Each structure stands twice: as C-alpha cells, then as structure tokens.
Amino acid sequence: MRILLLASLMIASSILFAQPSEFTQKWLDTTAAIILDPYQGNDIDWDQVKNDKRVVAVIHKATQGFKTDKKYLTRREFAKSHGYKWGSYHLGIPGNPIKQADYYLSIAGINSDEVYALDIEDINPTTSMPLDSAVIFINRIYEKTGRYPLVYCNRLVQESISQKVDENSVFAKCPLWYARFRKEIPDFSSKIWKKYTLWQFSSELNCSGRKNCPYWVPGTNGYMDKNVYNGTIQELQNRWPDI
C-alpha cells in the first residue's frame, strides 16, 4: 500500500510540474489568449486563422522610424471587420523621438479601441531607439492618446532598463511585451515590471514548421510571431485596449 501511495504521489507531482504557468510554457494554458503580431513580410490566411478560437487579437507593425508598413491599413480594416481586437507597434530607431511618435500616430490614428506599442529591439543606440529617447516617445504617446504604450523588449533590453532607470520611471507605467523564445523564463528581472503582459514566445527563431513549433496557428507560417497573454481570453477581451 505504501509503495502504491508513493507511486501515486510521484505521478501526481509530475503532472503538477508539467502544467503551464506564468513563466513556463504559458501558451499551453488553453484558457490563455493568443495574439499575432505580423508585419508586411508575413502571409496570413484569415479564413484559416479563424479556426483557432484562442487567437483574439492582432498587434501589427505600423511604422519603423519614418517608414510605413505597406499592409498595415488594409489588414487593420479586414481584421477588425472579422472581430479581432487590434493594436499597432512602432519600431523605434535613433533620431527625434517626438517626430517618430507623431509619425506613428499619423498612421495608426488615435483610436480608443486600439493598443499602442513601442518596439525597442536592442541596446545598441546606433541601430535602435535609445532609452532616453524611448522615455520621450512614451510620454508623447501618452500626451496624445491618454494611454501608455506597451513596451516590447527582449531580455537584454529589459535588463538594461532595470539597470539604468528606477522604479518610478515611465517604463513602469507601460505594460511589458516580453520577447523570450524558450519554454521557461527562470531569470525574469522584476525591478521595473513585476510581470509581463504579453510573452512573445514563437518566431522564425524557434518555429520552422508545424511539427517543430511551440504553437501553430492555422493560416500562418513559421516566421509569424506569436504571443500569449498573461490572462484568459475573456480577460483580454474585457480589458482591451487597457491590457
């Protein structure tokens, strides 16, 4: 009897530890919403995407510096007409952050039902928007829209932000959109953000086909970026765009 009890406890423990959690394969939680973030280089078959009921929102690239994504406007119209929540992001570059913010909003528009986001790709100030410029950009978006944008960053950028700014920084007012292409996040830096809002967990870096991908959305291909929301589908739908 004792052996059987021990075996049962071991099986139960293994099942428990295999369950998805906030920092472990969150995309396996079937109650969690999935968000796509395409750009003009991605192909989308919307009729096929509709087969995945967990996909409820799209955050599309709108601008990069002073360039516009060619498919942004047509895809926004199509996605919203098919019931998807919509958001946009600006990929920040070196240069005047106020002019970049204004250009971004001239394309994305000021809409009460859409999410805004700033993409800080890396910590190299010669190729990506420096952090001091990002602060100005964020404040400009808030000034114009009354809402803070999501901040998209990877581990290196998040750690750089944590090292260079304090807890009262404007960054702490922005939801975190965290890029990390692994099954677990054992080293999340919680100085500025206590949690992520979106976890970008899949891209061409770790998804090369239907059989070799953390999560496959029909109607997309391996290089389509996919994100999981740190909450349920219903919570995302209720809170959007204030996620």
Each model region followed by its residue ranges:
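Catalytic domains of cell-wall/extracellular-matrix polysaccharide-remodeling enzymes
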Residues: 115-191
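Bacterial Sec-dependent signal peptides at the C-terminal "C-region" and cleavage site
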Residues: 11-22
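Noncatalytic linker/hinge segments flanking ATPase motor cores
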Residues: 75-79, 99-100, 126-133, 155-162, ...
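Substrate-binding cleft of extracellular glycoside hydrolase catalytic domains
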Residues: 20-147
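Flexible, glycine-rich phosphate/dinucleotide-binding loops
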Residues: 67, 95, 158, 185, ...
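Functionally critical loop-and-helix segments that line ligand-binding/catalytic clefts
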Residues: 20-37, 42-46, 52, 167-243
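Sec-dependent N-terminal signal peptides
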Residues: 3-13
